[in-house]
Amino acid sequence: MILSTINLRGIGGNPKFSTLRRLFVLIHLDLVMVQETMFDGHKVCQLFLKLFPGWEVCAIDASGRFGGLLCIWNPLTCDLAPFALPFGILLVGHLKGFDEEVKILNLYGPYRDRMSFWDGLASCGILHDGLFIMGGDLNLTVSTDEFWGNTHRDPLADYFSDLSVQLVWWTCARIPWLPLGIMGEVVT
């Protein structure tokens, strides 16, 4: 089972889209969470369904030149039901090889008013019950290992450290439009 989360900063460009397609084929991804599609949700779903017939997709519209979320998954390995939420896309169901129900959240965290955003997410209860995978652009540093020098420590990092979450570090792949060719997180 290979899951990935990728911040594209615009999905419409030909180099990005063709490289993303090669990524799907070469790595045999089972589920991908995309942030910052900068695209209409319905159009991006249709685009992916043409390339990957039989796969399932769910998308949230971009707001002007920012935002836009997409989840795409292989129904042979992921039996998931999508729910569009004010703060992201929630997928609920089962992954091949796991008996327990899993919740997968793809979100794009805000730059401003982050505390009320995370308080709202925490109060809805999905962070506490059962298996949970969160991917996305959090606009937040959640690992204390990432703080250095006189960097201001974000109180939300303490919230995550209190949840007993396991952070998954990046696995490298060559994608030309990203700095140093680093891809989003890949979980195997």
Regions found by a protein language model. Give the residues of each.
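A shared catalytic/ligand-binding motif for oxyanion handling
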Residues: 1-188
